[in-house]
Amino acid sequence: MNLAAMDPQTYDAQLEHKRIKLEQAFAQFETPSVEVFASEPANYRMRAEFRMWHDGDDLYYYMFDKVLNEKVRCDQYLPASVLINQMMSALIAELKPNPSLRHKLFQVDFLSTLSGEILVSLLYHRQLDDQWRTNAAALKAKLSSQFNVNIIGRARKQKIDLDKDFVVESLQVNDKTFLYKQIENSFTQPNAKVAVKMLEWAIDVTQDSQGDLLELYCGNGNFSIALAQNFNRVLATELAKPSVEAAQYNIEANGIKNLQIIRMSAEDFSDAMAKKRSFRRLEGIDLDSYVCNTIFVDPPRAGIDPDTLALVQGYERILYISCNPDTLKDNLEQLYKTHRVTQFALFDQFPYTDHMETGVLLERR
C-alpha cells in the first residue's frame, strides 16, 4: 500500500500512465488502441482487510505502508466502499469497550456489495468460546439496526458463522440484473463497478458468436453466467469447491439453463480434451457434443500452463482476461503465432497501484 499515491486529483494522470505503459509493452503484437475503462477515484473497493492495533484502551485499524516502511492508522480508508467506511466506524465503537470481542483480535476483513450487504470477519489469536458467540450475536443485533450485516469469527482451525458466510451481490449489466453469491474468504472481483464494465465489454465483443463457449477458471460463474446469452451452450471448469458451489447457486438464481460447471482443474480438463486420461467427474458429459468455437480464460496471476495454452490455441476465438500483463505477454508470444489481437482493453480494477487488469480478444488468422 502507498497512501501517498491515493490522491483522486491525480487519478486521471495515473490511469493515462498505465494506458501508455500497456500499449508500449504490447506493441509487438500489433494490437488495436487500448480501450480504457476507468474506476471511481474513491470508494471503489468492495472488500478490505485491516490489522488491529491494541494500545491500552484504544483499538484501531492499521495497514502497512511499504513506501514509508511503517504501519499507518486507518480510521477511514479512501479506496473502500462507503458501506465499509461506515461499518469501520460503527464496529470499532462496539469493539473497544467489549473485552470478549477485542481480546487477541488481530485482523478484521470486510466484504461489501453494491446491493447493500456487508460481511465482517473477526480473526483471533485464540480459540472462540460460548461467551464470544453470545457477545458476537449481541454485536450483530446492534449493528443490524443500521446495516444488513453478518459476522464470522475465525481462529486457528475454527470458524463460527452466526448466520451465513456469504453475501449476494446484484449487478446491473446493460439491461439485465445478475445475482452473484460471494463467499467469505473466496475470490471475488474487488471493484464491482469496474467488474460490471468488464462483463459488458465481454458481452459486447462476443455478441455475434456462433456455437458454444468453453470457459476455464470460471470461479463463481461471474463471466459464464453473463455470457451465456451469447452462446448455444456454455461448459465451464473450476477447481475450488466453494467457488463451484457458489457458481451452482448463481446459475439457479439467475435462471441460466444452458450452462454446465465441471469441478476440475484446467490442466486436467486439457488432458481430458486431448483424451490422455479419463475422469469420473466427466461421466455423463459428452465433450464431443460441444461445438466450442470460442474459449474464455481468466487464469491466476501465473498465467496459463503450456498444456492448457496448447488447448486454448486450438480455438477460433480466444477471450482472455488477465490480472498480470507479464504472464499475458508470455502467453501471447505463443498465441500470436496463430491468432491476431482484435480487441484490447484496460480495466482499472486497482487504482493507485501498478496492477493492470486487461482483456484481449484473439481471432484465428
Swiss-Prot record:
Q: Name one GO biological process term.
A: tRNA methylation
Molecular-function GO terms, alphabetical: rRNA binding; tRNA (uracil(54)-C5)-methyltransferase activity, S-adenosyl methionine-dependent; tRNA binding
Its keywords, alphabetically, are: Methyltransferase, S-adenosyl-L-methionine, Transferase, tRNA processing
Q: Which reaction does it catalyse?
A: uridine(54) in tRNA + S-adenosyl-L-methionine = 5-methyluridine(54) in tRNA + S-adenosyl-L-homocysteine + H(+); uridine(341) in tmRNA + S-adenosyl-L-methionine = 5-methyluridine(341) in tmRNA + S-adenosyl-L-homocysteine + H(+)
Q: Which residues bind S-adenosyl-L-methionine?
A: Q189, Y217, N222, E238, D298
The UniProt entry's GO CC annotations, sorted and at most eight, read: cytosol
Query: What's the superkingdom here?
Result: Bacteria
Supply the enzyme class, top level. transferase
Name the catalytic site residues.
C323, E357
EC number, as in UniProt: 2.1.1.-, 2.1.1.35
Q: Which SUPFAM superfamilies match?
A: S-adenosyl-L-methionine-dependent methyltransferases
Family of this protein: Belongs to the class I-like SAM-binding methyltransferase superfamily. RNA M5U methyltransferase family. TrmA subfamily.
Question: NCBIfam families of this UniProt entry?
Answer: trmA_only
What is this protein for, i.e. what is its function? Dual-specificity methyltransferase that catalyzes the formation of 5-methyluridine at position 54 (m5U54) in all tRNAs, and that of position 341 (m5U341) in tmRNA (transfer-mRNA).
Q: Name the chain's protein.
A: tRNA/tmRNA (uracil-C(5))-methyltransferase
Which gene holds the coding sequence for this protein?
A: trmA
